[in-house]
Amino acid sequence: MEEQITNNIPDGMGVTTEPAAESIAEPVAESIAVPAAESVAESLPEGQSAADGAGTHVGLSDDGLVLRAEGLVKRYGKRTVVNDVAFDVKQGEIVGLLGPNGAGKTTSFYMTSGLVVPNGGHIYLGKEEITKLPVYKRARLGIGYLPQEASVFRKMSVEDNILSVLEMTGKPRDYQLEKLESLIREFSLQKVRKNLGDRLSGGERRRCEIARCLAIEPKFIMLDEPFAGVDPIAVEEIQEVVWHLKYRNIGILITDHNVQETLAITDRAYLLFEGRILFQGTPEELAADPIVRKNYLTDKFVLRKNSFQDRPAPVEG
C-alpha cells in the first residue's frame, strides 16, 4: 500500500520520508467492505455550511452532512507540501481537487481519505473529528474510498464482487439479492455479470467498483483518479455514472489530472498551487479567472459540459 501511495504522489513528495503506513491500521479494501454506521446526521444539530465562515466546524449544511477539511498541513522532512488548505463537500454535490503536479492536491486528498496523517489541521464529518481515523473506520461512518488502482477481486465474478460486500451488511438475504439485481441493472453490468474481475475493461471495472461501493450506502465517496486507465470512449460513461451519484444525495470528492473531464461534472472545484488554495468556485468561475488560466488551464482551455447533464434526474430503483 505504501508503494501505491508513493506512486500516486507527485515527484518530490514521496511518503518514504514519512511513511503513511501509520494511518492505515487495516487494508484499504475494507473501505468498500464495511457496513456504514447509523447516520451521523440524525444525531447532530442544525449547523452552518462552509460559506458561513472560516474556522467553524459545524458539519451540517441546510441540505445535509458536510465533510470538511480545515487548515491542513503536511510536511515531508523540511519541505511543506500542504499549507493551511481548507475545503468542504456537501452531500449531493461533486467537488474537484485540482492542481499541477506538486501542488499538494493528492496529499490533501489522501489526508481527507485517511491514507496520510496530517501534521496540522482537522478533518470533520459533521461535528465528529475524524482526522486520525484510518480508512476502514471512516468507511464505517459512511465515507467510501475508491483508489486509482483496480480494487475489484480479480478472480471473482462481477456479481460476486458486489454480493461479497452486501453479505457484510448483515441485511436479510432477500434484500441482498434484490439490491444486487438493482445495482447490476443501474450500472449496466448485465452482460458482464458472470465475468471475472480480471477480464473487465477499464470502464466495466470502474462501474463494478462504484456499484460495489454503493452496496454499503455511503454518504460520501472519494474518487482517486477515476478517469485513469479508462479508454477515451468510456470516459463519458464514467462521468455519467459519477454525475448520477449526486441524485442519491452522495457527496463526491474527486482528484484527477484530467482537468477537462473533472470540471465537466463538478459543481465546485478547488485549485491548489504550491501547497495552498489558489482559487475556489464553480467550473465556470474557475475557467474564466485570468490567474487560473495563466497558472494552470492556459488560454486555450475551453470548458465543456456533457449532454447527459441536461436530462431529467434518474429515478432510483
What are these regions (language model features)?
Residues 129-149, 173-177, 283-291:
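ABC ATPase NBD coupling module
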Residues 196-200, 204:
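Conserved ABC ATPase signature
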Residues 113:
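Helix-to-loop junction immediately C-terminal to a conserved catalytic motif
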Residues 98-100:
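The feature captures the beta-strand-to-loop junction immediately N-terminal to the Walker
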Residues 217:
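Conserved catalytic motifs of ABC-family nucleotide-binding domains
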Residues 174-192, 239-243:
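Conserved ABC ATPase "signature" region
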